[in-house]
Amino acid sequence: MREIVHIQAGQCGNQVGAAFWSTIADEHGLDSAGIYHGTSEAQHERLNVYFNEAAGGKYVPRAVLVDLEPGTMDAVKSGKFGNLFRPDNIIYGQSGAGNIWAKGHYTEGAELADAVLDVVRREAEACDALQGFQLTHSLGGGTGSGMGTLLLSKIREEYPDRMMATFSVAPAPKSSDTVVEPYNATLSMHQLVENSDETFCIDNEALSSIFANTLKIKSPSYDDLNHLVSAVMAGVTTSFRFPGELNSDLRKLAVNMVPFPRLHFFMVGFAPLAAIGSSSFQAVSVPELTQQMFDANNMMVAADPRHGRYLTVAALFRGKVSMKEVDEQIRSVQTKNSAYFVEWIPDNVLKAVCSVPPKDLKMSATFIGNSTSIQEIFRRLGDQFSAMFRRKAFLHWYTGEGMDEMEFTEAESNMNDLVSEYQQYQEAGIDEGDEDYEIEEEKEPLEY
């Protein structure tokens, strides 16, 4: 009932996806062969949202794995949960996209797209009541960004009334893997604005700084980063996977979080932030979780919520947590920091509690914020994009695959529009700037 079909595209998307599947398989009591060993009814009750029961009581992820080169797939298959996936659902090319969005979207990726859509269709048909799709990918490369958004638009065309969520890894502001990242990301954003219903934004730099500042680990591996991302993904999807009342499916989450259809880019956070292996032995409480969850330094994307205002927020607590305490804590955050929440959406912080905590933790909290400050990412991308595009630098790699410069111009202006829309709602509701907001100081204002 209410199934979600998951698609992972490109190297980053597959590695993040693999981490997500191993995390939720653990949470639902599945071993690496997909056999259920759970101990509580809650683990089993909504298992079929993400898993399909196959012969012999084996549970198989409703996942489609896509890449334009074989390397990542070999890595996923040889990983701990590599045998979990259905072999026919793993589809890869040989040529690679060479970090060129146009190859993923128009040439190499387009050749593979029909084979992928056949598998997606088969997965969708195996569902009783498909609620929608989720895609994990990065925006800076060629396959995840180019082919990922191609699949997005094709699925949107075929299933217009189903929800579409993406977990999108944005290019980091200072450290880049490829010089053409701004092109790839801007062209992808152009697609995400139109074809995604909810996009959870993540970037490697924000993750690295969480490791450096909060966890005191100087050079984290990609596995460490993916562990953090999978913790957030597991947190975000908790209310779909376990019994609960609030935000119990993709559509309800979107209804609560997206006041205007284009403004569906969320920043995410997780608490308690514990490094891999060192399961946090310190006692955590709801006030501590709330403080850490709203802390600007713990956002998993390089945008500072203190520079904007929250349109909506969803806070999800897991473990033995009293709803009353959650209500009190969230109310206190809102009263002390009222300037950071738009006043024209009353009750814009949603709270949910799920009794099943993550593995090795007593309790945890996941944060989803629709903040106008997310425009910082798009601004930064836009600046980098126009610096190169003005000189037509590297354009031949794209026009050579049949792209037109017009598409670049359109993508650029769509992103600039998005920035202005966020800015407009950030300022809305204040009487033409004559009110100065002051934050009341109380005993311990949450650090923003």
From Swiss-Prot:
Cofactor requirement: Mg(2+)
Subcellular location: Cytoplasm, Cytoskeleton
Alphabetical keyword list: Antibiotic resistance, Cytoplasm, Cytoskeleton, GTP-binding, Magnesium, Metal-binding, Microtubule, Nucleotide-binding
Assembly, per entry: Dimer of alpha and beta chains. A typical microtubule is a hollow water-filled tube with an outer diameter of 25 nm and an inner diameter of 15 nM. Alpha-beta heterodimers associate head-to-tail to form protofilaments running lengthwise along the microtubule wall with the beta-tubulin subunit facing the microtubule plus end conferring a structural polarity. Microtubules usually have 13 protofilaments but different protofilament numbers can be found in some organisms and specialized cells.
Other remarks on this protein: A cold-sensitive nda3 mutation reversibly blocks spindle formation and chromosome movement in mitosis. Rhizoxin, an antibiotic that exhibits potent anti-mitotic activity against most eukaryotic cells except for yeasts, binds to beta tubulin.
Coiled-coil regions, chain positions: none
PANTHER family: TUBULIN (PTHR11588)
Protein name: Tubulin beta chain
Single GO term (MF): metal ion binding
Biological process (GO), any one: intracellular distribution of mitochondria
Physiological role: Tubulin is the major constituent of microtubules, a cylinder consisting of laterally associated linear protofilaments composed of alpha- and beta-tubulin heterodimers. Microtubules grow by the addition of GTP-tubulin dimers to the microtubule end, where a stabilizing cap forms. Below the cap, tubulin dimers are in GDP-bound state, owing to GTPase activity of alpha-tubulin.
Principal location listed in the UniProt entry: cytoplasm
Similarity annotation: Belongs to the tubulin family.
InterPro entries: Beta-tubulin_BS, Beta_tubulin, Tub_FtsZ_C, Tubulin, Tubulin/FtsZ-like_C, Tubulin/FtsZ_2-layer-sand-dom, Tubulin/FtsZ_GTPase_sf, Tubulin_C
Keyword flag Cytoplasm: yes
Ligand binding (GTP): 11, 69, 138, 142-144, 204, 226
One family name in Pfam for this protein: Tubulin_C
Keyword Transcription: no
Region of interest: Disordered: 429-448
GO cellular component terms attached to this protein's record: astral microtubule; cytoplasm; cytoplasmic microtubule; cytosol; microtubule; nucleus; spindle microtubule
Annotated positions binding Mg(2+): 69
